[in-house]
Amino acid sequence: QKALEAVAPKYPNVKFAIVDASVKAPNVRSLLFTEQEGSFLAGYLAALTSKTKKLGFVGGMEIPLIKKFQAGYEAGAKTADPAVEVLPAKYTGNWDSQDKGKVMANALFASGADVVYHAAGRAGLGVIAAAKEQGKFAIGVDSDQDEVEKGFVLTSMIKRVDEAVFQTINDLSMNKFSAGEKIYDLKAGGVGLSEMKFTKDKIGKENLDKVKE
C-alpha cells in the first residue's frame, strides 16, 4: 500500500489496482471485499452444523483485515444459535507455517470445538489437515478449498479476487477504468460460500436452506 501511494503520483498516466487496501489517487482502483459478510455465512453454517456447540477460529496475522473475518464469523454463529460458544481466536503469527496452523487447530479441537474456520493463508492448510486427523470440520478461505480434504472442509468462504481483477482489466481494455474504491460484497457476488459438494449430506437440506435465506 505504501509503495503504491509513493509510486502512483509519479506515473499519472499509468493505471494501477490494489487488492485489500485503499489508495486515494486519480489513477488507482482499490478492490475491496466485505469479508465479514462471507464470514457471517460461514459462522452461521458452522453453528447449525456443530454438535458440540463450540467453534474455533485461526487467523494468520492479528491485523484489521483478519479481524473482519473473525468478527463476521462470530456474529454469524451467534445469530444462528446464541448458545454457541466461539472459543478465543488463535493466531499463527505468519501466513506460511502449516505446522503452526495445525497446532492451533488441534488446541481448539482439544477444547471442544468441532468446526474451525481459518483465515491464515497457507498456514490454514495445517488447520484442514488437523480437521481430517481429528475427524472434525475446517472451513476454508479465499478460494474453494473443499477438495483439499474431501468431506472435512465444511465449506469455504470464497473471495472473488479473480473476478475483481478480470473486471478491472476488462474495464481498462474498454476505456472504462475508474479510480476509487470498488467494493465487492455478498450482493455483488464478491464473497460467498462454496458449493459444499462433499459435505451437503452431512449438513442436511434444512440447514442449507437456512443459510440460503
Regions found by a protein language model. Name each.
Residues 1-213:
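A residue-level marker of the well-folded mature domains of exported/periplasmic proteins
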